[in-house]
């Protein structure tokens, strides 16, 4: 069979990951010719990767999405040349695999001689139009999904298909692509009498889900011999999964790929770490570590102690907390080298005396400049001493003295220490996590949610620090996904474990204490707060990913507290909004909040957005104090907030 393949590719930097060449290597065995169409850039590496399979590579302006990429290839060949092929396959880089030879699929479908066009999988449609804008049918028809669709010769030669593509309007958005092409193509040509079908029959799943390849991919791979799966599975909004599942689809998919196929899992990891936000893939894959309190693997624990260099970095300032700091260090393996910074010779002497009796390999205490606090001490003074180590932990004697009541700050310290260094066995289990997972770069405690820290969930943990973190990433040359709508998997509180190689790009910057503001240090929005949030992105840039670690005790408390938060919010919301599902509740409440904000009556807390805070700071610096306070008093009287503590 003479078969042409059209492969559409887009990646913002034009780099071609190995999962694509793995897919093309099998696909090409079933093709006579292959043409690749790239929207936007194609790097030197990317071109070399595609040239393994074809010399027909078109790089075009990034417009029209996949639809116009396919149209470009069709126009390049022309209908006369296209009519010489028995089949034209159109597919793209949104698919991963195969987990079984594609030849099985092509051979099976070759026997279906009655078909004019066919595909891999089907979307079962929806009663209404889930997209904004006008839809051809005002509902979502059953349709072949556009990630893999095949035209047969008779269909290619038809005037209806040729006219369809010749008159295809420019596609302006993803929604436009779905509504003008993917969701309507199948019905349009079925209504004209053309025959179609898909390789993966999911008629039995119509009542189960409208999108089987995303919602139950394991069933399709295991039970229906589907050879491919969606890359999007790993970066799909976890909240969207919760509308139809308990969050298990991607975890089941990964387990099946790991245990029942020979698909190279490193192809998934490398692409995830390079191109996806860890907030998405760590939740979809369930990468949060529940660390046991007793050693689970004696052999692995012994291997870490014998074969890896382990360091503990500590910045100690509060001498009344020295006993707690010693207890923290005492949980480290005896082979650990400890590097401590403090700000006075007197404190140095106290620390050396307190640590003298601890069973540790070596303890080095250094007096450093008292500027930039723990973050500056870590980057300027401690990090240069651990560059040759394998794994390290950083902690400081955290005392959130600005937080009232004091119990709130003390509990923040509990969250950090409980989940990073609960006991000696716990620490060994943490270290074996790094040994077992070559892509793990950072383990940090969960972000605190109690007391005033509840607003972490309101601002996705950014507060006024998104713009300064993004600017710091650019300064350091780190190009990884970052979004103000997604929480960084970061060590809030600056207590965490890390693979030293994972933070090398940050250590290489050559930090000086002058890079940090002098005392009194602002409560938020500084370079230190940006660094606190940039750790996970640095790790990603180095080829690793961040994750959270929790003790079993804390995980139970966390689960209970989240249920308490959810119940406390949902009960009053349900009196006003549609709370049938999480999605409906979020959508209706979000729409209401957006309307209030649009008309000037909204308030999203002290960290609503950094632009507003910067504007207030700009005014505060330039106006007389009394004038500024009067202006803000009028603003609060008219627009609010009226009943919450709010920093103007």
Regions found by a protein language model. Give the residues of each.
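ER/Golgi luminal nucleotide-sugar-dependent glycosyltransferases, focusing on the catalytic module
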Residues: 1-648
């Amino acid at each position: 069979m003479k078969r042409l393949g059209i492969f559409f590719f887009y990646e913002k930097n034009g780099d071609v990951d190995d999962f694509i060449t793995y897919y093309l290597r099998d696909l090409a065995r079933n093709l006579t010719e292959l043409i690749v169409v790239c929207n936007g850039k194609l790097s030197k590496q990317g071109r070399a990767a595609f040239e393994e399979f074809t010399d027909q590579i078109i790089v075009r302006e990034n417009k029209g999405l996949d639809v116009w990429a396919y149209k470009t290839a069709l126009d390049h060949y022309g209908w006369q040349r296209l009519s010489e092929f028995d089949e034209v396959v159109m597919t793209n880089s949104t698919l991963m695999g195969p987990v079984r030879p594609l030849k099985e699929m092509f051979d099976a479908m070759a026997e279906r001689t009655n078909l004019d066009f066919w595909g891999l999988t089907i979307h079962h449609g929806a009663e209404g139009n889930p997209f904004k804008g006008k839809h051809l049918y005002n509902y979502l028809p059953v349709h072949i999904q556009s990630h893999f669709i095949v035209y047969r010769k008779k269909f290619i030669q038809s005037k209806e298909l040729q006219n369809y593509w010749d008159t295809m309007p420019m596609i302006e958005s993803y929604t436009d692509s779905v509504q003008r092409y993917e969701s309507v193509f199948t019905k349009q040509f079925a209504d004209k009498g053309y025959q179609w079908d898909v390789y993966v029959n999911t008629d039995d799943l119509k009542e189960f889900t409208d999108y089987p390849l995303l919602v139950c991919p394991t069933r399709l791979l295991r039970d229906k011999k589907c050879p491919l799966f969606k890359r999007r599975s790993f970066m799909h909004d976890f909240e969207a999964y919760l509308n139809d599942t308990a969050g298990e689809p991607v975890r089941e998919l990964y387990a099946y790929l790991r245990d029942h196929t020979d698909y190279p899992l490193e192809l998934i990891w490398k692409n995830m770490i390079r191109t996806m936000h860890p907030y998405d893939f760590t939740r979809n894959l369930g990468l949060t570590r529940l660390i046991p309190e007793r050693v689970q693997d004696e052999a692995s624990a012994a291997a870490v102690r014998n074969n890896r260099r382990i360091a503990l970095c500590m910045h100690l300032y509060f001498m009344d907390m020295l006993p707690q700091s010693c207890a923290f260090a005492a949980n480290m393996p005896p082979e650990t080298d400890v590097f401590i910074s403090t700000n006075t010779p007197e404190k140095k002497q106290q620390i050396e005396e307190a640590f003298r009796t601890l069973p540790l390999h070596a303890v080095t205490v250094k007096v450093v400049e008292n500027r930039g606090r723990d973050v500056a001490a870590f980057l300027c003074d401690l990090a240069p001493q651990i560059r040759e180590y394998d794994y390290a932990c950083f902690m400081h004697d955290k005392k959130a003295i600005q937080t009232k009541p004091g119990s709130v700050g003390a509990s923040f310290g509990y969250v950090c220490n409980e989940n990073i260094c609960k006991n000696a066995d716990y620490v060994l289990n943490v270290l074996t996590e790094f040994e077992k997972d070559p892509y793990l770069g950072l383990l940090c405690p969960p972000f605190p949610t109690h007391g005033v820290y509840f607003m972490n969930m309101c601002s996705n943990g950014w507060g006024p620090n998104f713009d300064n973190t993004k600017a710091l990433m650019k300064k350091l040359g780190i190009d990884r996904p970052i979004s103000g709508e997604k929480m960084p998997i970061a060590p809030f509180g600056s207590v965490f474990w890390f693979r030293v190689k994972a933070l090398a790009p940050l250590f290489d910057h050559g930090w000086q204490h002058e890079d940090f503001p002098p005392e009194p240090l602002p409560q938020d929005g500084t370079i230190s707060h940006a660094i606190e949030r940039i750790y996970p992105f640095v790790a990603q840039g180095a080829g690793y990913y961040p994750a959270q670690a929790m003790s079993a005790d804390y995980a139970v408390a966390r689960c209970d507290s989240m249920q308490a938060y959810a119940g406390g919010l949902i009960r009053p919301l349900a009196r006003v909004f549609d709370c049938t599902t999480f999605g409906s509740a979020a959508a209706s409440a979000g729409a209401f909040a957006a309307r209030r904000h649009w008309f000037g009556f909204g308030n999203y807390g002290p960290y609503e957005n950094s632009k507003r805070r910067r504007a207030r700071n700009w005014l505060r610096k330039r106006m007389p104090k009394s004038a500024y306070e009067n202006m803000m008093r009028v603003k609060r009287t008219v627009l609010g907030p009226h009943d919450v503590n709010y920093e103007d």
